[in-house]
């Protein structure tokens, strides 16, 4: 690469020397020349020259020339800027030629310009940027969008329009928005086209998309060349075309595409800003052009609406008439950038002069040695203050017709944004915007800059687009190539479990469960898929599935169809469809019947359940005794008798055979709730015990993967599957312990012989295979432990294949319609359906966790009943206690006690006596106390009356 760069620079230097020989001028002194006229170096010059380098006869050039003229008039008429200094503009035509453009740039340098507006062409920009670097003259390009015009390589090249780096990222986001994976790039084969498409390819790669083909044609290609190019890309798979060409010749592409039938349904055409430049320049719009372009999506540099912009567009007709241009030369966005570029130079000069800087030029000392050769380069002067002037330009920050004019550290305009337009029969219609701040939106970008940056996929939004063929639904974006090549399908040539995939004599050449699912999914696709099945393997042993996946990734096969397991390592090389059957690794081991245990009757409950249940029986007996003791003679008597009664009553409720009757309301309520709990416990115990005694109990030495790893005994795996690598790499099992087995017969033989007979202790394989194995073994074996990987089988396609997405959708549709189950029953129905796992008695045990809600309800009822009982007893005790003396009451009142009557002493011994008394006795005592109080009250009244009579009159 360095060699080619060196050759290019040498060639460029030689060309510059040849061009300079076109004029030979007297040698001037090497001293500095002041640009000012009749003034000292410290005063402002009376005029300053600015160059303009562009192609006159082009859509962009015609609009730019009007903008340049308007800008110069406005600047010189504005007394607030460049006071006393006139700005002159020197035009130079590049004629779309690198040679002529370079010559024109040198002629501009002859006029001692302080800056040059242009060039229009990116190719010319690469050449003349070397001139700018040498002579320190800033070039401000309003139309060269090539992203490789680097600010590091070309420090004096400044872009006042947007960098195509952002436009290519916008197109990439558009492709990603519709989930397309491949595009065809059609571009002009020059610096502008090649470099822009190169950036597009890099941007697509970041989104897991790609350019499937780059279709380049030379500048100025005729329709015949374009037709041959489009005919070749039409044979390819992708139907997404990104067109990046020049506006003056780009419409020919769509004219040819229309004749080839490439503008109909299923096609997607995306263009960069060139198309809207061409259409905007047509006044009025050509109906024939719109007819060609219906459904095309085009990008355009976004410029915010403003009063100044509207006023400038309103002047356009007068400007065109003044310059005697054709009536159909319309306004386009590059006119705005050209206008702003001139104003940028003027404003920068104003700041430059206000800082006390001057404009001076000097001869280039590096060109002195060329004088003796006869080639005179003395008119190429260095702008001495060019570096400072460039810095002033980069520091400018104001609002122009194109929006905020400010440059970032990479010398790009800030806030890049684009319009997205859909071409319809009535003209272009905006469907949204793109900016690097928010991605796609339907609101103008400047209204979103105040919000945080957000480019997440879920927040992207565009309005409805009408695609070619007047289709509303977004096209799929690809078809099968029209070059006659069918889909190459690799099918594993299995020697075992042939009902999944195997060789056959039918027209397809293969058959099986996986083949039927693939064929059923293919039939659901809305397009034909030519295909051919190719067996993979020698038929003597199962092939390596990892090798099959590698051949798909290497483009030997387009897809692998069969019992291919989806695992992480394989997804790095291929794309899998939605799984069509669940799978996972399990352990199969020999089993034998277990002997019945004499303690089986204890197995229905866990130890915790037995303990909690026993405690509850005792507790309910105590609660019933407390509630019934005062009412029921059966719960009274000597302490020994009462303890026996509590125990007997508690456990007899288990069988609903308690002989004691409950009398109190609270006791009956508690017993009712408890009997319901007992009913549930009894029923659950009976059901669990029945299951334990009736289900066949099987045992195995191997309880799962953990015991298998610890046993150091041989393990069998199916030859060709990923199980071997999983055991070795993930579980760190020694390879010497793993024995590959070829078919079902070897499986059964190895399990029956066992480790001592040269067999295996267990087999590790995928679940679908194990179901078939257990059925064919008459259920002599069982899986032990749990399934320790969970995955599935899918079809493996090449990376980024769009067919994988469509097939996944078809598989989901098969599942929803029940067709997957029908195919499964056709191929995977076995004579003996075996229970997969060994039944464990622990699975039938009932724990406290299953009953904690019921026990909680029971406890709450008991608590409420005991609370009501205690409240009643305390109330009775308060009424039966002896009356306190008046002196105690008086002392309490004098002390101001807040508790008042609550200071009465409570004797625990007296309280227990009240609790132990019969309810009838308590009621009798309360009645007697009430009568006594009544009599005492009457006596007090009589005594007071007698005292009143004895009082002297």
From Swiss-Prot:
Cellular compartments annotated: Membrane
Family the entry assigns: Belongs to the glutamate-gated ion channel (TC 1.A.10.1) family.
Matches recorded under CDD domains: GluR_Plant, PBP1_GABAb_receptor_plant
Family annotation (Pfam families): ANF_receptor, Lig_chan, Lig_chan-Glu_bd
Gene Ontology CC: plasma membrane
Subunit structure: May form heteromers.
Residue intervals on the Extracellular side: 30-606, 690-850
Chief localisation class: membrane
Residue ranges, annotated region (Disordered): 928-953
Signal peptide: 1-29
Keywords noted in UniProt: Glycoprotein, Ion channel, Ion transport, Ligand-gated ion channel, Membrane, Receptor, Signal, Transmembrane, Transmembrane helix, Transport
TM regions (residue ranges): 607-627, 637-657, 669-689, 851-871
Stretches assigned to the Cytoplasmic side: 628-636, 658-668, 872-953
Name of protein: Glutamate receptor 3.5
Glycosylation sites: 38, 95, 223, 371, 397, 436, 454, 569
Membrane topology category: Multi-pass membrane protein
Function summary: Glutamate-gated receptor that probably acts as a non-selective cation channel. May be involved in light-signal transduction and calcium homeostasis via the regulation of calcium influx into cells.
GO annotation terms (biological process): calcium ion transport; calcium-mediated signaling; cellular response to amino acid stimulus
Expression across tissues: Expressed predominantly in roots. Also detected in shoots.
GO molecular function, one term: glutamate receptor activity
């Amino acid at each position: 690469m360095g060699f080619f760069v060196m050759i290019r620079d040498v060639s460029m230097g030689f060309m510059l020397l040849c061009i300079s020989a076109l004029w030979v001028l007297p040698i001037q002194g090497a001293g500095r020349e002041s640009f000012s006229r009749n003034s000292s170096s410290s005063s402002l010059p009376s005029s300053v020259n600015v160059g303009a380098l562009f192609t006159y006869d082009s859509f962009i050039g015609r609009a730019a020339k009007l903008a340049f003229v308007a800008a110069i008039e406005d600047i010189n008429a504005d007394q607030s800027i460049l006071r006393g200094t006139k700005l002159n503009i020197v035009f130079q035509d590049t004629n779309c030629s690198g040679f002529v453009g370079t010559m024109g740039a040198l002629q501009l340098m002859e006029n001692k310009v302080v800056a040059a507006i242009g060039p229009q062409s990116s190719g010319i920009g690469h050449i003349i940027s070397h001139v700018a670097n040498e002579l320190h003259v800033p070039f401000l390009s309003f139309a060269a969008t090539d992203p490789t015009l680097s600010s590091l390589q070309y420090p004096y090249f400044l872009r006042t329009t947007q960098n195509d780096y952002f436009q290519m990222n916008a197109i990439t986001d558009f492709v990603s928005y519709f989930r397309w994976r491949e595009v065809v790039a059609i571009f002009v084969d020059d610096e502008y086209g090649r470099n822009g498409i190169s950036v597009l390819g890099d941007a697509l790669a970041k989104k897991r998309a790609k350019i499937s083909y780059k279709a380049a044609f030379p500048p100025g290609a005729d329709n015949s060349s374009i037709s041959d190019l489009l005919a070749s890309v039409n044979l390819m798979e992708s139907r997404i075309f990104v067109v990046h060409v020049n506006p003056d010749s780009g419409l020919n592409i769509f004219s040819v595409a229309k004749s080839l039938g490439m503008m109909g349904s299923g096609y997607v055409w995306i263009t960069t800003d060139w198309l809207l430049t061409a259409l905007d320049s047509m006044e009025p719009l050509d109906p024939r052009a719109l007819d060609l372009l219906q459904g095309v999506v085009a990008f355009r540099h976004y410029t915010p609406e403003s009063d100044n912009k509207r006023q400038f567009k309103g002047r356009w007709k007068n400007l065109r008439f003044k310059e005697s241009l054709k009536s159909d030369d319309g306004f386009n966005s590059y006119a705005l950038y050209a206008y702003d570029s001139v104003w940028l130079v003027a404003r920068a000069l104003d700041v430059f002069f206000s800082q006390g800087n001057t404009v001076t030029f000097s001869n280039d000392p590096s060109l002195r040695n060329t004088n003796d050769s006869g080639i005179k380069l003395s008119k190429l002067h260095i702008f001495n203050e060019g570096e400072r002037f460039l810095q002033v330009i980069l520091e400018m920050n104001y609002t122009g017709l194109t929006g905020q004019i400010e440059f970032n550290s990479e010398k790009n305009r800030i806030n890049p944004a684009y319009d997205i337009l859909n071409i319809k029969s009535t003209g272009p219609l905006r469907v949204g915007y793109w900016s690097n701040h928010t991605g796609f939106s339907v609101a103008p970008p400047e209204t979103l800059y105040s919000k945080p940056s957000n480019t997440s996929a879920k927040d992207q939004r565009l309005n409805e687009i009408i695609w070619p063929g007047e289709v509303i639904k977004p096209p799929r974006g690809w078809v099968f190539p029209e070059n006659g090549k069918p889909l190459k399908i690799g099918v594993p040539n299995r020697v075992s479990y042939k009902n999944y995939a195997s060789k056959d004599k039918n027209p397809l050449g293969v058959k099986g469960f996986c083949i039927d699912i693939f064929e059923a999914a293919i039939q659901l696709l809305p397009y034909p898929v030519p295909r051919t099945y190719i067996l993979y393997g020698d038929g003597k042993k199962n092939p390596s599935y990892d090798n099959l996946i590698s051949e798909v990734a290497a483009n030997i096969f387009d897809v692998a169809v069969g019992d291919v397991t989806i695992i992480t390592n394989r997804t790095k090389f291929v794309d899998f469809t939605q799984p069509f059957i669940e799978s996972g690794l399990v352990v199969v081991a020999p089993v034998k019947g277990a002997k019945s245990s004499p303690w089986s009757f204890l197995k229905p409950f866990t130890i915790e359940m037995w303990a909690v249940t026993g405690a509850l029986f005792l507790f309910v007996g105590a609660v019933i005794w407390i509630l019934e003791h005062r009412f029921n003679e059966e719960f009274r008597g000597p302490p020994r008798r009462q303890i026996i009664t509590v125990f007997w009553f508690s456990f007899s409720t288990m069988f609903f055979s308690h002989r004691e009757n409950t009398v109190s309301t609270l006791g009956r309520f508690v017993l009712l709730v408890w009997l319901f709990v007992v009913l549930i416990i009894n029923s659950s115990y009976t059901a669990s015990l029945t299951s334990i005694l009736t289900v066949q109990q099987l045992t195995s030495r191997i309880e799962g993967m953990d015991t298998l790893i610890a046993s150091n005994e041989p393990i069998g795996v199916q030859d060709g599957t990923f199980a071997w690598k999983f055991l070795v790499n993930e579980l760190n099992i020694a390879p010497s312990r793993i024995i590959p087995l070829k078919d079902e017969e070897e499986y059964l033989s190895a399990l029956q012989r066992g480790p001592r007979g040269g067999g295996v202790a267990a087999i590790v394989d995928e679940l679908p295979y194990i179901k078939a194995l257990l059925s064919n073994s008459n259920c002599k074996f069982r899986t032990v432990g749990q399934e320790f990987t969970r995955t599935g089988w899918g079809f493996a396609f090449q990376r980024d294949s769009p067919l994988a997405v469509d097939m996944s959708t078809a598989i989901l549709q098969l599942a929803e319609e029940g067709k997957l189950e029908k195919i499964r029953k056709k191929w995977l129905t076995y004579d003996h359906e075996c229970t997969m796992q060994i039944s464990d008695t622990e699975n039938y045990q009932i724990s406290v966790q299953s009953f904690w809600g019921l026990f909680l309800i029971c406890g709450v009822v008991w608590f409420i009943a005991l609370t009501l009982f205690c409240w009643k007893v305390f109330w009775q005790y308060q009424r039966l206690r002896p009356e306190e003396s008046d002196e105690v009451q008086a002392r309490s009142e004098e002390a101001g006690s807040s508790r008042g009557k609550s200071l009465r002493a409570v004797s625990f011994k007296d309280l227990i006596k009240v609790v132990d008394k019969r309810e009838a006795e308590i009621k009798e005592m309360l009645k007697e106390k009430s009568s006594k109080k009544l009599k005492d009250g009457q006596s007090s009244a009589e005594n007071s009356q007698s005292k009143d009579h004895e009082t002297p009159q």
